[in-house]
Amino acid sequence: MVIKVAVIVVFCLLFWAGCYVGTGTDQKNMKGFRSYPIKVQELVRRNEELSKLAPKKVSIPFTILLNIVMFVVIFGIIGVILKFTVGFSSFAEILIYFLIFGEVLNLFDLVVIDLLWWRNTKRIRFSFIPEKQFYQNPKQHVDSFLRGILVFAIVAAVVSTLMFII
């Protein structure tokens, strides 16, 4: 059990490290463009230099599908490693583990990364919008968290089924 909990903790820290490394310049910050408040997105789209880098609008259902596929692959790899090292005793154990894993990651992303770090660090600010107040609206983050609840439930069900079959 300790190893399974450690995997979740390490994954959360790696997830945050990825967010940290993926920010710091205007170009890097464009990767997380949809996480920015709508007002910031509008200002970036009006900026002559950065508007060229702004991603096209992607539908939410498409984004959800991409997230499901990505996390099924990632959690599937982790699941196989755990199954053949520390093991799982039943389908229910696998399902509960990956439900907890996904929802802990989702909550960590909302509280630690988005609300505590992201909204307060200068790393995510665009050079032509340095004022902190532009980045304080949590709506995009909360909406993402709410979608994540469903995404990680689906991921847990799919991964559990695959792990049970293997």
Locations of the language-model features?
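Juxtamembrane/disordered regions of integral membrane proteins
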Residues: 1-92, 96-166
